[in-house]
Every structure is written in C-alpha cells, then in structure tokens.
C-alpha cells in the first residue's frame, strides 16, 4: 500500500478522536479553526483533528469509529472512510 508507519498511528488517533468526541474529525478541524475553545482540543495528545475519522452509528448509537490516513490528505481520507461506511448496511448513514 506504500504508506508509512506514521499513517497507522494517525488513523488510530483519528478513530479515537471520532469515537471519543462522537464527531467527524473533519468537522472538528473546521470548528477548531474558528473557535478558540475548540482549538484547545489540538493540545490533547491523543486527538487528531484532521479529516478521515468518523464515528460509526447503528440505530442512532455510536458503536465504534473508523480512522483513515495515507490517502493523500484529509479530504481523500474522509472520502475513503465514508465509502467504507457505505459498504456496511447495518450502519447508519453519516450526517454530512
């Protein structure tokens, strides 16, 4: 697949961020740029506010998360995560 080991760490942090905040990491990144209180989240070492992390929901409940890294940037990583969610019919469609 050609990605470096740092992408494994980044994908894990994106998944952790999506799970712990119950939010799309791309949305968090955008919010952090415009809100000083949200920007404080960037100082939490475990969190990574870059696109590619999505919470997984089934019947409205968060049941896990996915994190994607190494796809060429935050938006391609997010697109890959969305495609993965779409392939699992038991999961709710994410709200965009």
Regions found by a protein language model. Name each.
Residues 1-96:
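Flexible, solvent-exposed loop/hinge segments and secondary-structure transition points
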């Amino acid at each position: 697949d050609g990605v470096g080991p740092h992408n494994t760490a980044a994908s894990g942090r994106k998944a952790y961020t999506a799970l712990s905040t119950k939010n799309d990491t791309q949305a968090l990144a955008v919010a952090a740029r415009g809100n000083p209180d949200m920007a404080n989240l960037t100082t939490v070492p475990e969190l990574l506010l870059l696109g590619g992390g999505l919470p997984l929901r089934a019947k409205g409940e968060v049941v896990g998360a996915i994190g994607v890294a190494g796809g060429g940037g935050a938006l391609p990583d997010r697109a890959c995560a969305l495609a993965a969610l779409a392939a699992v019919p038991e999961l709710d469609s994410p709200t965009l």
